[in-house]
Amino acid sequence: MLHDVDYVLRKLDWLRAEGIWPNGLRYLWTDAFGVVLYVSLYTETGEERWLGAADRLVADVERVLGRRRGLRIGEAADRDGQYFHYLAMWLFALARLGDLKPKYRKRGIALARDIHPAFVIPGRGVIWKMQEDLSGPYPGYGLGSMDAYDGYVSYRMLGEDALAVEIAQMRDLMERDWRTLDIEQDLGLGMMLWLAHFFPDEPWAEAQKRRSLRTLETMWVDPPGYFSRAPWLGDTKFAFTNYGVSLGLQAAGIWPGRVDRLNAFFEDWRSGDEYDREAITWVMACTSHLPGAFLTRGGEGSTERDEPRERSSAGPVVDGSASRRKGRG
């Protein structure tokens, strides 16, 4: 596991000076990674300023993206709707910050209870993208392929007892799915490795780790040192998705040389498009160099009990013919 705090501090100074992050547009996925990064920096340095930065970031995300239920995908006009896997990553961030400040764990539990009935169809799946008010699926979007795994892990990080019903529903969806699930894109493979490392002895995690590593092996391109977008797209590469693979590999404790190779390659490589200056690229680069609080510390899963719940009404039912989405990023 890398601990390159100096790299992260230099990159954060540059991001702020350029008005990219955290003083740019809000984007839920990036900001979730950012909250965990701040927790990692606090853990590494012991400096209270990083907890203050996390407090301010959470407050700004809730102010800008928060809705009556859930959080919008991003601040930009074309980032409407709500993604479940973005929300799940935000829940994970609240759990990690909640390890240090319990109010955030309570906030995460409340958010999970609020959004779960809208996205989850028990026994069927998790809707990948919903309309912004959670009134129904976003047009053209069906069931996600990894979303139950996202929710399962984040819910367990927040509270095993407080979210027992929701965890059981996610576990049931996974049990129906893990034997046949084949992930084919780089970021999804990296994130599955990351998800699996929290509960490595569970059958789904053992199987998906093996399968993900086998697929990633076919996607490694060296020279120069990167993972392609998919096995059949050897020339297609994205920096931020490779950084997600790096997180997964460090979670799995495998291929450290490849982690170093891809970090070195993407530090200098430029795509020539907007991603060269997108916050998602460089916040995830920081995570690749300092995974820290993203990784298990043993004894994961909170048993904290919360106040009696107020259940939301059940969400909409999606036509069973809706496609299952495998892509990420």
Region annotations inferred by a language model:
Residues M1-G329:
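Glycan-recognition and catalytic cores of secretory/periplasmic carbohydrate-active enzymes
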